[in-house]
């Protein structure tokens, strides 16, 4: 098991943790419906880049 040789100072500890933050995933707005969705994914109502790709239960 790895054990540290010396105590890490608060400054070094902060530098080590500097990339541990959470980031919101990038979202896009569907131009036809105005809904937000993950980029490069189909929106919840079946549209992708302004075109209807997938039939949904609401369509039937």
Swiss-Prot record:
Ranges of Basic residues compositional bias?
49-60
* Highest taxon, organism lineage: Bacteria
Concerning Pfam families, the annotation shows: Ribosomal_L32p
One cellular component (GO) term of this entry:
large ribosomal subunit
Single GO MF descriptor: structural constituent of ribosome
Signal peptide coordinates: none
Say yes or no: keyword Cytoplasm present.
Answer: no
Keyword annotations from UniProtKB, A to Z: Ribonucleoprotein, Ribosomal protein
Q: Could you give a single Gene Ontology term from the biological process aspect?
A: translation
Q: Which family does it belong to?
A: Belongs to the bacterial ribosomal protein bL32 family.
Full protein name: Large ribosomal subunit protein bL32
What organism is the protein native to? Answer: Bordetella avium (strain 197N)
Q: Which gene encodes it?
A: rpmF
């Amino acid at each position: 098991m790895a054990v540290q040789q010396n105590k890490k100072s608060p400054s070094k500890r902060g530098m080590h943790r500097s990339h541990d933050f959470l980031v919101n995933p990038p979202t896009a707005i569907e131009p036809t419906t105005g809904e937000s969705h993950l980029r490069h994914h189909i929106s919840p109502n079946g549209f992708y880049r302004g075109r209807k790709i997938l039939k949904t239960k609401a369509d039937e």
